[in-house]
Design a protein with these regions (language model features):
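Histidine-centered catalytic/metal-coordination loop motif
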Residues: 70
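Conserved short beta-strand edge segments in small beta-sheet-based binding/regulatory domains
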Residues: 73-86
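Short S/T/G/P-rich N-terminal loop/turn motif that feeds into the first structured element of a domain
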Residues: 1-51, 59-66, 83-86
């Protein structure tokens, strides 16, 4: 299991679609529908920067990147391995 921080950035024209994806992923987490081993820990949106920072637990970085490929959010995203201190 790894802890990840994922930074998403979108263009203004993609904002509505980006928020649809965020909403559906949050609903999947709330309803226990994410694939086994994946947990969305937090979502922080900085709207005036068209950015979201999400914290995840996942089986591996590669598994998470595979999930991102399937979801295909309308964002540019960076995935960072992180160490949770608090």
């Amino acid at each position: 299991m790894v802890s990840l921080v994922v930074e998403h950035r979108w263009k203004e024209k993609n904002a509505q679609d980006a928020f649809k994806v965020v909403g559906s992923i949050i609903d999947m987490q709330k309803n226990g529908k994410l694939p086994s081993g994946f947990t969305l820990k937090s979502v922080n949106v900085v709207e005036n920067e068209r950015m979201a920072v999400c914290e995840w637990d996942a089986p591996s970085v590669d598994d998470f990147k595979g999930l991102l490929e399937k979801v295909n959010p309308p964002t540019k995203h960076e995935v960072y391995l992180s160490k949770r201190l608090l």
